[in-house]
Amino acid sequence: MQGKLTFTSKQITGIAVLLALVIVLQAVGGTVSIGPVQLNFTLIPLVLGAIIFGPWVGALLGFASGVVVLIQVIMVMVPFYALIWANDPIVTFLTCVLKTTVAGFLSGLVYNMLKEKKAVLAVFVASAIVPVVNTALFILGCLCMTNSVYAMANGTNVIVFILVSLVSFNFFIELAINLILAPTLHKVLKYIKI
């Protein structure tokens, strides 16, 4: 697959399974709430796809995840979602779709750059990139929606509100989940010949 986007039927099947996992986990069950903390498992198939099939598949899986998030923002009656969609639909659209698309692409790209030198390190870095880029682009999107975010912040500093109320523990939990599962992903890669 070097330099071209052609896939065998076995690879297409693998991509389809990961795509279905991303969509289903994002739509109905990828998040487990424990108190104020949400354990998000939807990024795992995205990372796995980026590592196994490359950056373009990572981007495809990220795009699918972002579209599901966008649909949830539009359809689910959550005050924050309603506010940002009503006030900043273009920025909301771009934030939802681009954050995971870019994260998936960069994860696969960095993995490909590092895998020949240090395979285990490549898996860890690729696994960490997705929640880091996803969260960074979410924060950037929120900063572009300052008026909407300020309305939800109830007088709190917008940056403090974003970091404490919207990001806080979830980023660290997503990062930990990805980094804990990285060795497992690495072992899976050794046995899967797709």
Question: What residue spans do the PLM features occupy?
Answer:
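Alpha-helical transmembrane segments and their cytosolic interface
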Residues: 1-19, 125, 139-142, 146, ...
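Hydrophobic transmembrane alpha-helices
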Residues: 1-60
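Helix-boundary and loop/linker segments of multi-pass membrane transporters
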Residues: 7-11, 36-37, 80-86, 115-117, ...
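Residue-level signature of the transmembrane alpha-helical core
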Residues: 16, 20, 59, 63, ...
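Juxtamembrane/transmembrane-helix interface segments of polytopic membrane transporters
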Residues: 22, 26, 69, 73, ...
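Structural signal for the C-terminal ends of transmembrane alpha-helices
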Residues: 51-56, 109-115, 186-193
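Internal alpha-helical transmembrane segments of multi-pass membrane proteins
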Residues: 113-136
